[in-house]
Structure formats: structure tokens, C-alpha cells
Amino acid sequence: KTENICMKKALDWSRLVNQSMAMVSDTKKPPFEGTEDALRLAREYADIVILTAANRQEINKEWEVFELAQYTDLLMSQETGRKEECLKTLLEKGYERDHVLMVGDAPGDLAAAQGTGVLFYPILAYQERESWEKFSKALECFTEGRYAGVYQEERIKEFQENLHIEGK
């Protein structure tokens, strides 16, 4: 609870976004082509955690409708905390930093990965299908311990160029 008018407006806006997402038909927001194949493959080698800033109820519904939930072990959503906090929680449970690969499509995803020292694989805007198709190569590098370093740096550079953002 807060008396801060800005915080109240932000909370109201967040609730409206969640309500509007619930009104969009699930058939109108299918996963990108290649997503299921990538999850199925990754599931053979790793625990899969959905880490999203979205509403837990909506994500659960979407992932069930498209039968993606079967490939996941845990859902961490806006109700769980910010992405960086969620990654820290996973690390506290015993995951090693170089054994965590965050897959994301937003600058905040990269920032959360970098802020916690975990690895990052980008899904490029307007190249989502291609990004998911290339994921098998990234997963191979990841499972063989070759992801960190040059391979990851190249992926991050592609991501930053795709979004026209400056690298740090």
C-alpha cells in the first residue's frame, strides 16, 4: 500500500494491461514457430524455467493451450518478482552461473542476465523463427561449455544491433 500517486497510476496501468491480455483470444497469440522444438530439445539437457514479467495466470493459460507447459519445470512471473531477483533466487538454489542460459527478447532480459552473471541467448525482433531455429546450435555450445565468451558476445552484439541499442 502506498499514497504515492505515481505508484497508484503504475499499479492501475499494470492491472489494465493484465485485463486486456485476458481479453485477447489465445488462438491469436500462438508461440513463434520453432519455440516448441527448441523447448523439447532443451528439456533433454536442462531444467526449464519460464521467467516473465507477465501475469502468471495468463502465461499458465497460454502455455497450457499450446501444450508448452509440459516442457517446463517452474514459472516465475511478475508475482514472483523482477527478473533479476528471480535469477538470483535460482542461483541461491544451487545453479551455477555458467549453467544458466537466459533466453530473452528484451533489453531488460539482457540486463537481468548480465546483472546476475548468467549467460544470455537473444530472440531477435522480426527474426523470431530464425532465432529459435538457431537455438539448437546455442544449446550445443551451452551444454559443451563453449557458450561463454566469443559465442555469447556475438549473440549479444546481434541483439543490440537488432534493437539499435548501444553495447556496454
PLM regions and their residue ranges:
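A metal-dependent, Asp-based hydrolase signature
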Residues: K1-S25
